[in-house]
From Swiss-Prot:
<keyword id="KW-0399">Innate immunity</keyword>
<protein>
    <recommendedName>
        <fullName>Halictine-2</fullName>
    </recommendedName>
</protein>
<keyword id="KW-0964">Secreted</keyword>
<keyword id="KW-0391">Immunity</keyword>
<comment type="similarity">
    <text>Belongs to the lasioglossin-like family.</text>
</comment>
<feature type="modified residue" description="Lysine amide">
    <location>
        <position position="12"/>
    </location>
</feature>
<keyword id="KW-0044">Antibiotic</keyword>
<keyword id="KW-0929">Antimicrobial</keyword>
<dbReference type="GO" id="GO:0042742">
    <property type="term" value="P:defense response to bacterium"/>
</dbReference>
<dbReference type="GO" id="GO:0031640">
    <property type="term" value="P:killing of cells of another organism"/>
</dbReference>
<keyword id="KW-1052">Target cell membrane</keyword>
<keyword id="KW-0472">Membrane</keyword>
<keyword id="KW-0295">Fungicide</keyword>
<dbReference type="GO" id="GO:0016020">
    <property type="term" value="C:membrane"/>
</dbReference>
<keyword id="KW-0027">Amidation</keyword>
<dbReference type="GO" id="GO:0045087">
    <property type="term" value="P:innate immune response"/>
</dbReference>
<dbReference type="GO" id="GO:0005576">
    <property type="term" value="C:extracellular region"/>
</dbReference>
Length: 12
């Protein structure tokens, strides 16, 4: 679940 937020931040 936490990875989702991290990935989104990196992708953005």
């Amino acid at each position: 679940g936490k990875w989702m937020s991290l990935l989104k931040h990196i992708l953005k």
